[in-house]
Amino acid sequence: YINRAFQYAYDGHNGQNRKSGEPYITHPLHVAIYLCELNFDKETIAAALLHDLIEDTDISYEDLKKEFGEEVADIVDGVTKLDKIKYSSNEEAKADAIRKMVIAMSKDIRVLILKLADRLHNIQTIEYHQDWKQEKIANETLYVYAPLAHRLGFQSIKHVLEDKSFKILHANQDKEIKDMITETNPDRDSQIESAIDIIKTLLNDNSMSAEVYGRPKHNYSIYKKIVNQGLTFNEINDLIGIRIVTDDVKNCYTILGLIHANFQPVLGRFKDFISMPKFNLYQSLHTTVLTSDGTKMEIQIRTHDMHYRACLLYTSPSPRDRG
């Protein structure tokens, strides 16, 4: 089935090339590979291979429906309709674009996921476009697709979309941040892995059930914190971040005690948003501690329900809401 979809797409795009000069089929193939890595069903993979045929060739919805069934044809048609949304540079239009895509999502969420994968590959090969086109794509990506990726739970995709867009729109600031990271904290990834191992061992030794995640703060998030909160680079406390998600509120406070007993807390950096939620109902415990080499590390502790709500709150009006 998927092989047949590939051959159909290959034939349909025959003679077409990307801006890079590569055969056009390389694009839908990359999109399909992304979705394979996410373990999507064969219909979604087939739709990924076929997703540009209606827009860029003489092949119609009815042709796809006849060859691959209504389900695949509907997904491709949904992606084609999203491509026709006109974007503007003002915030209201961007918000309206998001609402239109959410409406499309209510019919079949796979349309949006495929579109995210499509945008992920396009932003990674954007250098072949003219500068004005790169800026247009980067703006769309930063204000529409990256928040959408977050809403759908695809954090790694969100970070790539944000950082690639940020590099295009704010190249100088992006380089400054990269240089500062290299100078002050070049071993972040290994520090995070070490911290996760230590915390997991600590929780296991104390029979605490929890999931532990770690991530380096990516460049666009650093930039937002500097701009929105008026911080200097050295004042940012979560260049290394750990999130602990557990079953109930009691566990949150027990884990906090274990963290403070085994790491040195940074004075003035503990915030209890569980007992005193933010006005948008965000809840979590935030603390900043020092690793063995003196590196600051922010730790967030929350329940699964709190984590779910936090994800939904991502696009709240004020950038300060997320602390």
Question: What does each of the following model-derived ranges do?
Answer:
Residues 42, 56-57, 83:
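Amphipathic alpha-helical interaction segments
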Residues 5-7:
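Thiotemplate assembly-line natural product biosynthesis machinery
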Residues 41-50, 71, 75, 111, ...:
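Alpha-helical scaffolds flanking conserved acidic
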Residues 63, 67-78:
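Hydrophobic or amphipathic alpha-helical targeting/insertion segments
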Residues 51-52, 118:
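DG-centered beta-turn motif at the end of beta-strands
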Residues 1, 10-18, 25-37, 46, ...:
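Nucleic-acid processing machinery
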Residues 53, 75, 79-84, 94, ...:
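Transcription initiation cofactors for RNA polymerase, centered on bacterial
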